[in-house]
Amino acid sequence: MEHILHVEDESDIREVARIALEDVGGFKVETAGSGREALRKAEESLPDLVLLDVMMPGMDGPTTFQALRKCPATAAIPVIFMTAKVQSHEVDRYKAMGALGIVAKPFDPMTLADQVRGLWRREE
């Protein structure tokens, strides 16, 4: 079973995604409500994938991504961004940073796991 760390500052979105990824997708999901919490949890649990919200207060998604890449323990963990503002130049920027791709919000809980799996498989 793949272990995903989902980082999202909005608790309702975190919970819907957790249910969608665990119950529909069969993933093991750990959650974090901020970039700082994500860094700590990623280093402790070494997830197989980080699903990372772009817009968060404090440490945003791109900043969190860069911090993950600087830490030797988490540098190779694949990252998929989630954002409500999907524009081609932003998608290109996140991919240039090294992200696997983008999941648009709002997302369909019934297809979220398949979207994540599809982006993840392209990397393998």
Regions found by a protein language model. Give the residues of each.
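Active-site beta3 strand of CheY-like receiver
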Residues: 45-51
